Regions:
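Active-site capping/gating regions of soluble enzymes
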Residues: 204-237, 241-243
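Active-site entrance/lid segments in N-terminal catalytic domains of soluble metabolic enzymes
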Residues: 1-204, 232-237, 242
Length: 247
């Protein structure tokens, strides 16, 4: 076993030191960014925040609201909807068992596709990313793949054909991976290290999980994240599909 003895950080471990600014109001801050991706020919401009593809967060109702603000929604892979035509702010989600010859949606309805698994450290996962980049239905898409939490895995996934790697093993508010398996990595350090690896290859990352307050989103971007994926911070809103529990 190799012991990592250098300090690793989470969101609660740091604060952003203030600096002098030319802005006179927070309203003057420009939140939108424009991206061009490594493998895909697509570009995208908007606010780089993504509603998570969790069961009760990545809903059609959530997408309808967030797209008004040019924010992305990753639809849960169990959401069955034919209401979407071409939409640049919708991300479709699939798993490793998905037959790319028989996608559960019209492949022409969105430029994004997300391969979502709990553990991106398998050969099967990387092979599937390569298959997606070569397959007729997905080869031109903006491919998101994850999750991983180390720079070596980030580089491997980008080289396999992904445009964006999803970063985070176990930081989510309802995720039990760390408790049940002991596997994970402090999310802020994971973001810093994986962003450096991805950007060195012309790729991008999504910080997925661990944000509980708006300041965590700011820290994620400061650490090098290109996109931030939110689940718990959006859960409980009217657009979620979960049942209301009154305690």
């Amino acid at each position: 076993m190799r012991i990592i003895d250098d300090i690793k950080l989470d969101f609660n471990d740091v604060l952003i030191a203030p600096k002098r600014s030319q802005l006179t109001s927070r309203k003057e801050a420009i939140l939108t960014r424009e991206f061009k991706f490594k493998h895909s020919n697509h570009t995208w401009a908007g606010i780089p925040i993504i509603a998570s593809n969790m069961d009760h967060t990545g809903t059609n109702a959530m997408a309808h609201v967030l797209m008004e603000y040019h924010i992305l929604t990753a639809l849960c892979k169990f959401v069955k909807s034919t209401e979407w035509g071409w939409n640049k702010n919708i991300i479709r989600t699939i798993g490793l068992d998905q037959n790319l010859d028989n996608l559960p949606y019209d492949s022409d309805t969105a430029p994004w596709i997300c391969l979502d698994v709990a553990n991106g450290y398998t050969e099967r996962f990387n092979d599937y990313v390569s298959l997606m980049r070569a397959h007729e239905a997905t080869k031109d898409k903006i491919i998101i793949a994850g999750n991983v939490c180390t720079p070596e895995a980030t580089e491997q996934i980008i080289l396999a054909g992904a445009d964006i790697v999803k970063i985070g093993i176990g930081p989510g508010s309802v995720c039990t991976t760390r408790k049940m398996t002991g596997v994970g990595y402090p999310q802020l350090s994971a973001t810093i290290e994986c962003a450096d690896a991805a950007h060195g290859l012309g790729g991008h990352i999504i910080t997925d999980g661990g944000c509980t307050v708006p300041g965590d989103i700011a820290k994620s971007f400061g650490a090098g994240a290109d996109f931030v994926m939110l689940g718990g911070m959006l859960a409980g809103h009217d657009e979620c599909a979960g049942e209301v529990s009154d305690d």
